[in-house]
Amino acid sequence: MAFWVGVSTAADTNCAHEQISIYYKTKHKAKFCVELAINNEERQRGLMFRKEMELSDGMMFVYDRPQSVSFWMKNTSIPLDIIFADEAGKITKIFENARPFSTTSIFGGYDVKYVLEINAGLTKSLGIKPGGLIKHSIILPGN
């Protein structure tokens, strides 16, 4: 799945995964090329054991229903920004600069259906904030 960040057009043309867009600041859009983590095994492994990640890449965790979620950075060597979103794809919380290998729990909220992990610093540099909207075909309008 791809998610355009505005930092590179590589996500648009060379994406081997899925493409996703985030709309923020009214008319601004960022795209990223992201892997989807849909089942329990994929969600548990996440980005663990990865040594690097392209600037416009990421991973989106998809849950069957809105729920309480917490993340940690165990075995994850890439510093990340973690974006939590509700059933409609609306960004409800952002945790910036999650520390590699930390086992400290990062609570995302109670009604989270989607979690997007991107390279640390991108939410701040792009101005992505709670209230923004994640768009992808898996996120149905009106949810």
Language-model-detected regions and their locations in the chain:
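Compact, glycine-rich, soluble single-domain proteins
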Residues: 11-143
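Bacterial N-terminal signal peptides
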Residues: 1-6
